[in-house]
Regions:
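Basic, helix-initiating cap at the start of DNA-binding domains
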Residues: 1-28, 32-44, 57-61
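Amphipathic, non-transmembrane alpha-helical scaffold segments
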Residues: 10, 18, 60, 64, ...
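Base-recognition residues in the alpha-helical recognition helix of bacterial helix-turn-helix
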Residues: 26, 50-52, 62, 66
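Short coil/turn segments at alpha/beta junctions that flank glycine-rich nucleotide-binding fingerprints
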Residues: 27-31, 82, 103, 144
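Key DNA-contact positions within bacterial/archaeal DNA-binding proteins
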Residues: 47
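Short secondary-structure transition hinges
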Residues: 58, 91, 97-136, 143
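Hydrophobic alpha-helical connector segments
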Residues: 62, 76-102, 157-160
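Hydrophobic/aromatic-rich alpha-helical bundle segments in the mid-to-C-terminal region
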Residues: 107-112, 120-124, 128, 142-189, ...
Length: 198
């Protein structure tokens, strides 16, 4: 069946175009997606998309900004900035998982980029800034005596995010586990293993 006539098509805006692009990126990969694929998923002519965005890389930028802005924004929340460093770290880990679940498609796109374009390199740099901010909290928790000091802070941060980031590969929205369940399990596994023993 062909495309519906223009008059019958539902209206769409930039956010809708980005939503659909994210879905196609997660299915086909960024490099494997063309503007024609996105237009087809929207049910419009490819030229119509250019009224909203400059091109595929702009769609990628908008998509990863959603995830990055949420993650960086969370670092400014009171739970991430106030109190003992261990409490702040636990808050950051839990909120990271919540953000990953809430923005699963955008986070999935963010975690799959490889640095092939200027936008991808920018996103990777921003992701590393986030990782370094968390690493500083890990170091502070060690300095305060709440975490073991025999494990490298960069390694601890990588292990925490390795576990957290895996959520994008197996989490099923509407499934048996909520974001809170997953965050709680990660919190227990990570912090019971890292806690300094008396």
């Amino acid at each position: 069946m062909g495309r519906p006539p223009l008059a019958e098509r539902s209206p769409y805006d930039r956010d809708r175009v980005v939503d659909v692009a994210v879905k196609v990126f997660t299915e086909r990969g960024y490099d494997g997606t063309s503007m024609a694929d996105i237009a087809r998923a929207l049910g419009v002519h490819k030229s119509s998309i250019y009224h909203h965005i400059a091109g595929k890389e702009q769609l990628l930028e908008d998509a990863v900004k959603r995830a990055l802005n949420a993650l960086h924004g969370m670092l400014g929340e009171p739970g991430a900035t106030e109190g003992p460093s261990l409490d702040r770290l636990r808050y950051v880990v839990r909120r990271t998982v919540e953000i990953m679940v809430r923005q699963l498609p955008e986070v999935t796109v963010l975690l799959r980029i490889r640095g092939n374009t200027a936008t991808e390199r920018w996103a990777i740099a921003r992701r590393r800034e986030f990782d370094r901010a968390v690493q500083r909290i890990v170091a502070a928790a060690i300095a305060e005596g709440d975490l073991r000091s025999d494990i490298d802070t960069a390694l601890v941060t990588r292990l925490i995010f390795g576990m957290s980031n895996s959520v994008t590969e197996w989490y099923q929205p509407g499934g048996r586990l909520s974001a809170r369940d997953i965050a709680g399990a990660i919190d227990t596994v990570v912090f019971e293993g890292l806690r300094r023993r008396p």
